[in-house]
Design a protein with these regions (language model features):
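Active-site-adjacent loops and short helices of periplasmic peptidoglycan-processing enzymes
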Residues: 1-96
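Domain-terminus/edge residues, biased toward the C-terminal soluble/receptor-binding domains
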Residues: 63-64, 75-80, 84-243
């Protein structure tokens, strides 16, 4: 089934053996529909079963305007999503699986087809031109079909601020990337990040009825605050509240 897909593909052949790592590269870099289906069949046994898992996960993420019918995004009735839902999905991906950037930032790379006929090289080229055109780009994924037109979920990082810009239904690929760049530029212009790298020292805390009369306290992590209102972050006051 995977070997018969249309659209963007890496031309997998029936009986071909590939690693999961290679298939993720094919999906992330070259938008390979055949690699998507091969992964779906490997994970869930069939594309339909995997699509059911996709819809369940989408519902759990609050993607209220999304319904998946296939695993690769080719045009089909009732297959739909929204820019907001794509942003939710993208945020989950880059937050829970930051290693995706190791794939989404590949510009060009070769894979090796391994079939009964032997081995052959196939070149992958990233469909996300922002990787080369936008200085702070970290990914993430392009998409285009006759109905959806030109789309992209673009991720970028500057000064520890990570942003997602989603463009859908652009008339051509140049507009898609130009609009994504403009959105990211705007986001970076209005966002500033405060990180407390010198938090107040924490005292020991008294314990009643415990083995130890006092325990040491520590911070779980660095306190961060994202400001989009243009406030003077130098005026932030620190207050320490203990139980």
């Amino acid at each position: 089934h995977a070997a018969s897909m249309g659209g963007s593909q890496v031309f997998l052949e029936p009986g071909e053996t590939q690693t999961v790592d290679t298939l993720i590269k094919c999906i992330s870099v070259a938008s390979a529909n055949d690699a998507c289906v091969a992964m779906a069949e490997f994970i869930a046994g069939s594309e339909d079963a995997f699509v059911a898992q996709m819809n369940e996960r989408a519902a759990g993420l609050g993607m209220k305007d999304t319904n998946f019918v296939n695993c690769c995004g080719l045009d089909v009735d009732n297959h739909m999503t929204s820019a907001y839902d794509v942003a939710l999905m993208s945020r989950e991906l880059i937050t829970k699986y930051p290693q995706i950037h190791n794939y989404s930032t590949i510009w060009m790379e070769n894979i090796t087809h391994v079939t009964k006929k032997g081995s052959s090289e196939f070149g992958l080229t990233n469909t996300n031109k922002l990787i080369k055109q936008y200085a702070y780009a970290t990914g993430l994924k392009t998409g285009s079909t006759g109905l959806a037109k030109y789309c992209v979920s673009a991720t970028a990082e500057k000064d520890n601020i990570k942003l997602i810009a989603v463009i859908m239904a652009a008339p051509d690929y140049k507009v898609r990337f130009a609009d994504a760049s403009a959105l990211l530029d705007y986001g970076f212009s209005v966002c500033q990040l405060y990180q407390d790298t010198t938090p107040p020292a924490l005292p020991e805390l008294s314990v009643r009825g415990g083995t130890d009369k006092k325990v040491s306290l520590s911070y779980e992590g660095t306190f961060s605050y994202l400001d989009i209102a243009g406030n003077d972050l130098n005026l932030i006051e620190k207050k320490l509240s203990l139980p």
